[in-house]
Amino acid sequence: MKLKQRVVLLAILLVIFIFTKVFLIDNLDTSAANREDQRAFHRMMTGLRVELAPKLDHTLQSPWEIAAQWVVPREVYPEETPELGAVMHAMATKKIIKADVGYKGTQLKALLILEGGQKVVFKPKRYSRDHVVEGEPYAGYDRHNAEVAAFHLDRILGFHRAPLVVGRFVNLRTEIKPVATEQLLSTFLTVGNNTCFYGKCYYCRETEPACADGDIMEGSVTLWLPDVWPLQKHRHPWGRTYREGKLARWEYDESYCDAVKKTSPYDSGPRLLDIIDTAVFDYLIGNADRHHYESFQDDEGASMLILLDNAKSFGNPSLDERSILAPLYQCCIIRVSTWNRLNYLKNGVLKSALKSAMAHDPISPVLSDPHLDAVDQRLLSVLATVKQCTDQFGMDTVLVEDRMPLSHL
């Protein structure tokens, strides 16, 4: 063989060798990441059922101090939380020492302070479990049970970006009225034999109060985030106009994601991928009302998108509002870890996991079976949407590796 031919052959072999090494290394990295995702999934499934128990083992701290220490820029609570049941038990049972009207917003809520000084948001029951909310996908009152279910879905998806939520029964006559501010107390009334209140908010009306069953009111309690983590509000780039006949740009411009990618904080960092995660989360729960979102202040785009205010969910199990997935199908990217978790949850696993996670909540059953079935069905639509993206652009473009370290943040 001539020298020139040998050189060419050696060059070809060298290129093949390099590509083989790169391919194998990439495959090993991906396999290692997949194995870690699988281990995380098994850890989640093992600790899924949270039994509300008062005892805190091996600590002199209050449940409120423990929950406050969990918060970091990319998580509200960690993956493994042996004290979770004790914290949620405290949320569901601790004495209410003050009750006031809710913070800003359009929907009825009350701001409670529990023994030990912990703030929580109380959202009252407005509908029975089998009630179907008709109309626009964002129609109706807030659903307290949706807050509970959304928190547990956040756990199951491995996001850890939703504040803790638990169901609670309160006696309006003996637990709320004696410690209520004058502003809240002035909104109480009696309808038949039931104690009711209508609070203070944009849509709150005396003609539309929330009523207890006698004096006992069912609701949800959301743990207030620590004051050392002030929030910053952002307009959601895929928010709706809420005006009849007026479309938002994303509703008619299929290249809208390209414009979003050129604006801060979506041009770098994790925020755009958080938007995609949130679109998946909101689609599964049927929440078409995320017009704004919160992150921690002064985060320069590094903070997570916090999954607050999920009560406009689980309204109609027969309605799958595909437009909620617009960030996903317009950007055609998703985290590898999210994609892996979604695949682990198919074939009925998601429904079973969600039902199991909520089994010990004080207001269980939290969701009706049609809503649980709907979550499973919507998961298939999410997977199909990602498949369409990978068919069009390829796996390497669509699936993004973005595992951010948490402990040092």
UniProtKB/Swiss-Prot annotation:
Give the Lumenal compartment stretches of this protein.
Answer: 26-409
Q: Which residues form the active site?
A: 289
An annotated GO cellular component of this protein is: Golgi membrane
Instruction: State its Enzyme Commission number(s).
Output: 2.7.1.-
Q: What main location does UniProt list?
A: Golgi
Cofactor(s) recorded for this entry are:
Mn(2+)
Glycan-carrying positions? 193
List the catalysed reactions: 3-O-(beta-D-galactosyl-(1->3)-beta-D-galactosyl-(1->4)-beta-D-xylosyl)-L-seryl-[protein] + ATP = 3-O-(beta-D-galactosyl-(1->3)-beta-D-galactosyl-(1->4)-beta-D-2-O-phosphoxylosyl)-L-seryl-[protein] + ADP + H(+)
Identify the keywords attached in UniProt to this record, alphabetized: ATP-binding, Disulfide bond, Glycoprotein, Golgi apparatus, Kinase, Manganese, Membrane, Metal-binding, Nucleotide-binding, Signal-anchor, Transferase, Transmembrane, Transmembrane helix
Residue sites binding ATP per the record: 107, 123, 222-225, 294, 309
Alphabetically, which GO biological process terms does the record hold? proteoglycan biosynthetic process
Spell out which residues lie on the membrane's Cytoplasmic side: 1-6
User: Which tissues express it?
Assistant: Widely expressed. Strongly expressed in pancreas, spleen and fetal liver.
Q: Which GO terms describe its molecular function?
A: ATP binding; kinase activity; metal ion binding; phosphotransferase activity, alcohol group as acceptor
Q: Which domain of life is it from?
A: Eukaryota
Q: Which residues bind Mn(2+)?
A: 142, 309
Cystine crosslinks: 196-211, 201-204, 257-331, 332-389
Its family? Belongs to the FAM20 family.
Q: What does the function comment of this entry state?
A: Responsible for the 2-O-phosphorylation of xylose in the glycosaminoglycan-protein linkage region of proteoglycans thereby regulating the amount of mature GAG chains. Sulfated glycosaminoglycans (GAGs), including heparan sulfate and chondroitin sulfate, are synthesized on the so-called common GAG-protein linkage region (GlcUAbeta1-3Galbeta1-3Galbeta1-4Xylbeta1-O-Ser) of core proteins, which is formed by the stepwise addition of monosaccharide residues by the respective specific glycosyltransferases.
Q: What is this protein called?
A: Glycosaminoglycan xylosylkinase
Which species is listed as the source? Homo sapiens (Human)
Q: Which gene encodes it?
A: FAM20B
